[in-house]
């Protein structure tokens, strides 16, 4: 039976090699069973440009390339940590970059997919930050800085993000349900798949909509399998 896999929020980094091992294991054992793989953002804990080179980046690039060379399509939606992943990296591994919101047809079902950070509209500080860093001129400027400078900036942003989270309520960092319903009506879908919040679950709200939240990767992987039989985490 044909199936499609969805993953998100792996937050791969040199500091957590066990996550890379989990990813490699998934890519070599489970991923080849699918016809398509969707990565819904934050594959990397941070990304400072396609010109950066490291053992981690090479490993991920090779794993995705091996998958796409087998004829399995791989798609990527940017997360809040790796929104600077560019066409150079994507092309090097045969991966297709998708926009912030994308409608896909999954075995007869019309589904909206996204990373999920745009759904957290109650987090006003983050939404203001996102609006700034999504400006093309600012991204161009950042990507033309020396790698060492970019790395320092990324580390400062990451540390600030950790600090900010300790002062924010859980409710603020979760999706705004009214906005979720609004965006689903806008795209005329009743099924949504997203990540970002790390709260793996399948929310059934008949007859209105189904919202599937991908989990983050930690001690184990979080993989959503979609087939003609429906949705399940494996």
From Swiss-Prot:
InterPro entries in UniProt: Calcineurin-like_PHP_ApaH (IPR004843), LpxH-like (IPR043461), Metallo-depent_PP-like (IPR029052), UDP-diacylglucosamine_Hdrlase (IPR010138)
Binding site for Mn(2+) 1: 9, 11, 42, 198
Pfam families reported for this sequence: Metallophos (PF00149)
Pathway: Glycolipid biosynthesis; lipid IV(A) biosynthesis; lipid IV(A) from (3R)-3-hydroxytetradecanoyl-[acyl-carrier-protein] and UDP-N-acetyl-alpha-D-glucosamine: step 4/6
Cofactor: Mn(2+)
Residues that coordinate or bind Mn(2+) 2: 42, 80, 115, 196
Function: Hydrolyzes the pyrophosphate bond of UDP-2,3-diacylglucosamine to yield 2,3-diacylglucosamine 1-phosphate (lipid X) and UMP by catalyzing the attack of water at the alpha-P atom. Involved in the biosynthesis of lipid A, a phosphorylated glycolipid that anchors the lipopolysaccharide to the outer membrane of the cell.
A GO cellular component annotation in the UniProt record: cytoplasm
Manganese found in the keyword field: yes
Topology of this chain in the membrane: Peripheral membrane protein
Principal location: membrane
Residues that bind substrate: 80-81, 123, 161, 165, 168, 196
Gene3D superfamilies, per database record: 3.60.21.10
Any GO molecular function: UDP-2,3-diacylglucosamine hydrolase activity
The entry's keywords: Cell inner membrane, Cell membrane, Hydrolase, Lipid A biosynthesis, Lipid biosynthesis, Lipid metabolism, Manganese, Membrane, Metal-binding
Signal peptide: none
Domain of life according to the entry: Bacteria
Catalyses which reaction(s): UDP-2-N,3-O-bis[(3R)-3-hydroxytetradecanoyl]-alpha-D-glucosamine + H2O = 2-N,3-O-bis[(3R)-3-hydroxytetradecanoyl]-alpha-D-glucosaminyl 1-phosphate + UMP + 2 H(+)
Organism of provenance: Histophilus somni (strain 2336) (Haemophilus somnus)
Subcellular localization, as worded in the UniProt entry: Cell inner membrane
Annotated protein name in UniProt: UDP-2,3-diacylglucosamine hydrolase
Enzyme class: hydrolase
EC number(s) recorded for this UniProt protein: 3.6.1.54
């Amino acid at each position: 039976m044909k199936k499609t896999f969805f993953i998100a929020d792996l937050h791969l980094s040199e500091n957590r090699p066990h996550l890379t091992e989990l990813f490699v294991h998934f890519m070599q054992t489970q991923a080849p069973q699918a016809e398509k793989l969707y990565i819904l953002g934050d594959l990397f804990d941070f990304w400072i440009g396609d010109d950066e080179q490291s053992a981690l980046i090479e490993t991920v690039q090779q794993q995705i390339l091996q998958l796409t060379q087998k004829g399995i399509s791989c798609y990527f939606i940017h997360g809040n940590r790796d929104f600077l992943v560019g066409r150079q990296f994507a092309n090097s591994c045969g991966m297709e970059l998708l926009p912030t919101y994308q409608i896909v047809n999954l075995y007869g079902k019309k589904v909206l997919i996204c990373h999920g950070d745009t759904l957290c509209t109650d987090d006003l500080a983050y939404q203001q930050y996102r609006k700034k860093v999504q400006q093309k001129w600012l991204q161009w400027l950042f990507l033309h800085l020396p790698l060492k400078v970019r790395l320092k900036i990324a580390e400062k942003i990451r540390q600030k993000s950790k600090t900010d989270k300790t002062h924010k309520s859980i409710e603020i960092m979760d999706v705004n349900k009214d906005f979720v319903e609004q965006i689903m009506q806008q795209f005329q879908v009743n099924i949504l798949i997203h990540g970002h919040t790390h709260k793996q679950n399948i929310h059934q709200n008949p007859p209105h909509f189904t919202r599937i939240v991908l989990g983050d990767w930690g001690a184990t992987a979080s993989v959503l399998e979609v087939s003609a039989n429906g949705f399940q985490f494996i």
